[in-house]
Amino acid sequence: MGNCCRSPAAAAREDVKTSHFPASTGGGKKKPHQARNGGGGGGGGGGGGWEKKRLSVLGEEGSEVNGGIEEKYALDRELGRGEFGVTYLCMDRCSRELLACKSISKRKLRTPVDVEDVRREVAIMRHLPRSASIVSLREACEDDGAVHLVMELCEGGELFDRIVARGHYTERAAAAVTRTIVEVVQLCHRHGVIHRDLKPENFLFANKKENSPLKAIDFGLSIFFKPGEKFSEIVGSPYYMAPEVLKRNYGPEIDIWSAGVILYILLCGVPPFWAETEQGVAQAILRGNIDFKREPWPNVSDNAKDLVRQMLQPDPKLRLTAKQVLEHTWLQNAKKAPNVPLGDIVKSRLKQFSRMNRFKRRALRVIADHLSAEEVEDIKDMFKVMDTDNDGIVSYEELKSGIAKFGSHLAESEVQMLIEAVDTNGRGALDYGEFLAVSLHLQRMANGEHLRRAFLFFDKDGNGYIEPEELQEALVEDGATDIMEVVKDILQEVDTDKDGKISYEEFVAMMKTGTDWRKASRHYSRGRFNSLSIRLIKDGSVKLGNE
């Protein structure tokens, strides 16, 4: 149902202390949710018709607030936005406690399934026992326009964003995070709940401290289950989806698979199964080949790799349970796990935008040159706003101050990568072309057609491969001087089958490395999943109910 209580709350806390919130109901801002229902109190049959047919979502799971949510809570700035709802910083008018309020517009609950999802989310959050690792629900209520879930405020940001900022964790830190995630899974399973949407974005840190508690959020896709019960509905996020979900025959074991995917990402910075298309991702999951050859895996302990393998066991009957994961040698000896920052390798991939990324940047420039004016209009406007002295480049300082103006549109991870791209630019600034290339990389604007066109640009002889000479030629055009060394580094990183040249698949993999897979992991609709499932059945990748 979308993330709650995202990190801008930390800044908001100071604003609250300086009287952003009204002291009384009458002084508050307009009630945003009442206005959304389209049947306001202004008159005519429209309003009356809505009242007669008013949708009651929560039933016994919640309470009515006839005067609107702001009778009890003062709403402030927006903290996050999901498919169905918006999360606001809010304050309890009586206790003055700062909380998060996820408001789900009733207009977006178009089907009985949507309504049931919200009702079940509340029921599950009430059903699960209090835990330091699960965000607590304070109140669930509804008014004419929306359902409101008031919960504790988490100010430390997403696990997702910390992974991006660091590149990846040390083994010791990854073990601590994995333990928390699997303890949440164990608690859910013991109480008859499958989470069904475990991913880094659905874990928030309570505060900004390094040792902050990690909390699970968003039970919007969770479901109650009984021992032996199987489900067929395809839900979740593609990169974290277990193979039996795609086969439409699954149980609680899927949460262990998703936790295994998160562990893999914590250790190396990218997911184990990914491809250019949704169907490609699904087929990679069904194949189940896990890459432990690429850096930094040679430096990861055998115990860590063993746990990843057992959590990503394709057969759910053989996959570890939550209890078995917690008893695994690697987690049992977590305090002895290597504390060496493995992240230097992956973080440097994200940070540099040089060496391998010099080639990638060249490819992005090729793509940018062929984009329509409409496709780059927003990026061009952003560049103009940030280039305050109109000198045609965005300096480090201009970028930092400009980010604040666009803060609501850029995730922390994107901000971090933009700044780091400038740091390693050489001149400490971005011209428009470089800014456009970085933005393309961050916003995942390069689709299959764009990538194919860029590949053909480099594959001068049309033999289906980018060979060292062609790579050399491309880098000469881009002004590189240490060409032979750069070509060697690029091939070392991109040429995964070590045949001395870059195939289209390897080129696409290079272009996808970075933030794009994270963008793609956000909520996918049931309709798209059903279409994907049909395609997989038609091409023979999946046989229904086949484990």
Swiss-Prot record:
What's a GO biological-process term for it? intracellular signal transduction
Which residues bind Ca(2+) 1 per the record? 387, 389, 391, 398
Where is a lipid covalently linked (N-myristoyl glycine)? 2
**Which intervals hold domain Protein kinase?**
73-331
> Which UniProt keywords are present, listed alphabetically?
ATP-binding, Calcium, Kinase, Lipoprotein, Membrane, Metal-binding, Myristate, Nucleotide-binding, Repeat, Serine/threonine-protein kinase, Transferase
Question: Per the database record, which ranges form the EF-hand domain?
Answer: 374-409, 410-445, 446-481, 482-517
Task: Give the disulfide map.
Answer: none
Which GO molecular function terms does the record list?
ATP binding; calcium ion binding; calcium-dependent protein serine/threonine kinase activity; calcium/calmodulin-dependent protein kinase activity; calmodulin binding; protein serine kinase activity
InterPro entries recorded: CDPK_Ser/Thr_kinases, EF-hand-dom_pair, EF_Hand_1_Ca_BS, EF_hand_dom, Kinase-like_dom_sf, Prot_kinase_dom, Protein_kinase_ATP_BS, Ser/Thr_kinase_AS
Q: Where is this region: Disordered?
A: 1-53
| Annotated Ca(2+) 3 binding sites | 459, 461, 463, 465, 470
The record's active-site residues are 197
For the ligand (ATP), the binding residues are 79-87, 102
Protein name in UniProt: Calcium-dependent protein kinase 16
Read off the lineage from the record.
Eukaryota, Viridiplantae, Streptophyta, Embryophyta, Tracheophyta
